[in-house]
A protein has these predicted regions:
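Charge-rich, low-complexity N-terminal segments
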Residues: 1-47
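Long, continuous compositionally biased terminal/linker segments
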Residues: 38-66
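Short, internal acidic amphipathic alpha-helical interface segments
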Residues: 62-98
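Charged, low-complexity intrinsically disordered regions
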Residues: 90-142
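Short, highly charged C-terminal tails/helix-capping segments
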Residues: 136-162
Length: 162
């Protein structure tokens, strides 16, 4: 077991106490050193995953929420979200009708701490929340993309301020 994986497992124990769940280990796919996944089912269902390939940690999230709507609007929304996000990138699979998010962190000379990894996970879930709220405003309320994202950002900020 490599050092970064040990740190992840320590974090997962803390997440179980704090957040009530623990990511499950899955068989690594080709070139993966390890793979952990979890599913969140609230209003929207999201599959999250952390894998390490060589000296990179990959954090991913996949959802089908809103993916069957107008493809052009989805692509415009994802393009807009990608334009201001300094972590990660959203992509869309028209074949599978899935929205995907991925962020990559290099770990060549060091291991990330539990706190840093938790922050990466928190950031990923926050960006997925921004996608969900923005898409809801666009597809269910006919609000233009820029206005929808701005409103969603404000709403998320209010939540974290409380």
């Amino acid at each position: 077991m490599i050092e970064q994986q040990k740190i992840l497992l320590d974090l997962f124990k803390l997440m179980e106490k704090k957040d009530g769940f623990i990511p499950k280990e899955y068989k690594p796919r080709q070139d993966e050193l390890y793979r952990y996944c979890w599913k969140v089912k609230n209003v929207h269902e999201t599959d999250f995953e952390i894998v390490q390939i060589n000296e990179c940690l990959y954090f991913t999230a996949d959802t089908k929420s809103f993916a069957k709507n107008d493809e052009l609007k989805i692509l415009q929304l994802l393009n807009y979200l990608n334009g201001w996000s300094y972590y990660g990138i959203f992509t869309y699979s028209s074949l599978h009708k899935t929205i995907m998010y991925e962020q990559t962190h290099f770990c060549r000379q060091f291991c990330y701490s539990k706190e840093e990894i938790y922050d990466f996970i928190f950031g990923m879930t926050k960006r997925m929340g921004l996608y969900y709220q923005s898409a809801d405003l666009i597809f269910n309320n006919n609000i233009p993309i820029v206005e929808a994202v701005n409103n969603a950002k404000l709403n998320l900020k209010k939540r974290t301020d409380n």
